[in-house]
């Protein structure tokens, strides 16, 4: 498995050329690169030579070494969400690499810094939502691998304000999934307003998001019951710190089983699966005064909660999107301090179409990460 060596921190003067007035590594940035691109939703995923993007004055250019593969990438390719994608599009929003160039207005970054590309590539930073640190809700949010070419390429741009700061010496392959999956589930767990010792159910516990959610929940002091299908997935959940596991393919009464394990229902439920049925079941087994957090985004899904039960049990149902800059810093710190590990499988970027097939079939344990060098 390829591992990154230290980047040279040699900075050239501001210069004009193919990339305008920017600061770059003394070694030249190439004009072309390898990437995976599609020209229509659901169209062929082409691994080919494409131009290296030019960073704007407020952007950094990152030499992406590794990128996680997220279920959102599948939706972007299919185009089955209400928000239209940029076309043609390079997907990906979990890119980890090295800063090799910076726009003339960028401050606080150095050539050679480790940096990450998140789902939120940039925002206006002046609207009500941005002022309250809810940048992901900005009406002008720019989304990596959706409205902005993402990390399934060797070089990608990111707004210098939103790019994730990764500590030097970090394993870039393992940290890649933290940039979206890790931040997303960490924010969701915070949104559940739990306290140490509380039970939390993770629906979709063995997948890319779920496998990280189990670990973050454990590190935050919660008791975890994982929900997923299959013996192999149950073993993974237990290995990652889950106290109990419910196999939805075998249980006769999932609601009753979860409530029995948790002595009345979990205090919080984090729904990271893309199952509408699983989301609706969570409103039934959550503990009175508990919180159901919706994270997974199955196309066209509707969550239903029986009103009498909802009111009498005084439950909360809320959505949780990606985290802000503080959430990102905290989520990365959990990883850097060894509290969270990414169960990953690394394959070449050229194999991305095969990864999409496995994802569609629900056959992925943990997270796939692509190595952009092949």
Swiss-Prot record:
Transmembrane segments: none annotated. The keyword Mitochondrion applies. Zn(2+) 2 binds at residues 124, 127, 130, 138. GO terms for molecular function: alcohol dehydrogenase (NAD+) activity; zinc ion binding. Keywords: Metal-binding, Mitochondrion, NAD, Oxidoreductase, Transit peptide, Zinc. CDD domains: CAD3. GO terms for cellular component: mitochondrial matrix. Its cofactor is Zn(2+). Binds 2 Zn(2+) ions per subunit. The keyword DNA damage does not apply. Zn(2+) 1 binds at residues 70, 93, 180. It is found in: Mitochondrion matrix. Its EC number is 1.1.1.1. Signal peptide: none annotated. Pfam families: ADH_N, ADH_zinc_N. PROSITE patterns: ADH_ZINC. It catalyses: a primary alcohol + NAD(+) = an aldehyde + NADH + H(+); a secondary alcohol + NAD(+) = a ketone + NADH + H(+). NAD(+) binds at residues 204-210, 228, 233, 295-297, 367. Residues 1-26 form a transit peptide. Homotetramer. Belongs to the zinc-containing alcohol dehydrogenase family. PANTHER family: ALCOHOL DEHYDROGENASE 1-RELATED (PTHR42940:SF3). This is Alcohol dehydrogenase 3, mitochondrial. The lineage of its organism: Eukaryota, Fungi, Dikarya, Ascomycota, Saccharomycotina.
């Amino acid at each position: 498995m390829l591992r990154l060596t230290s980047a040279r921190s040699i900075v050239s003067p501001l210069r004009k050329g193919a990339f305008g007035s920017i600061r770059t590594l003394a070694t030249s940035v190439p004009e072309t690169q390898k990437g995976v691109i599609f020209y229509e939703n659901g169209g062929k995923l082409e691994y080919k030579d494409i131009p290296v993007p030019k960073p704007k004055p407020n952007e950094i250019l990152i030499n992406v070494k590794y990128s996680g593969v997220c279920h959102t990438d599948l939706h972007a390719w299919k185009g089955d969400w209400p928000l239209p994608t940029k076309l043609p599009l390079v997907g990906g929003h979990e890119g980890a690499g090295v800063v090799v160039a910076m726009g003339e207005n960028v401050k606080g970054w150095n050539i050679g810094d480790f940096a990450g590309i998140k789902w939120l590539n940039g925002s206006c930073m002046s609207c009500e939502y941005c002022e309250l640190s809810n940048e992901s809700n900005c009406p002008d949010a720019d989304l990596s691998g959706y409205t902005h070419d993402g990390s399934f390429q060797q070089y990608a741009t990111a707004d210098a304000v939103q790019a994730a700061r990764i500590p030097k010496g970090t394993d870039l392959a393992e940290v890649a999934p933290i940039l979206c999956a890790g931040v997303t589930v960490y924010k969701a767990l915070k949104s559940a307003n739990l306290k140490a010792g509380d039970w939390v159910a993770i629906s979709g516990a063995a997948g890319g998001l779920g496998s990280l959610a189990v670990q973050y929940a454990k590190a935050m002091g919660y008791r975890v019951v994982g929900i997923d299908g299959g013996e192999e997935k149950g073993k993974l959940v237990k290995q990652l710190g889950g106290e109990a596991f419910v196999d939805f393919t075998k249980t006769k009464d999932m609601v009753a089983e979860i409530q029995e394990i948790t002595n009345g229902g979990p205090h919080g439920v984090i729904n990271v699966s893309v199952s509408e049925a699983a989301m609706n079941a969570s409103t039934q087994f959550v503990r009175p005064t508990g919180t159901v957090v919706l994270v997974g985004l199955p196309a066209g899904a509707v969550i239903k909660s029986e009103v009498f039960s909802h009111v009498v049990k005084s439950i909360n149902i809320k959505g949780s999107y990606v985290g802000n800059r503080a959430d990102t810093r905290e989520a990365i710190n959990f990883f850097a301090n060894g509290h969270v590990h990414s169960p990953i499988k690394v394959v070449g970027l050229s194999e991305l179409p095969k990864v999409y097939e496995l994802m569609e079939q629900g056959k992925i344990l943990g997270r796939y990460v692509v190595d952009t060098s092949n």
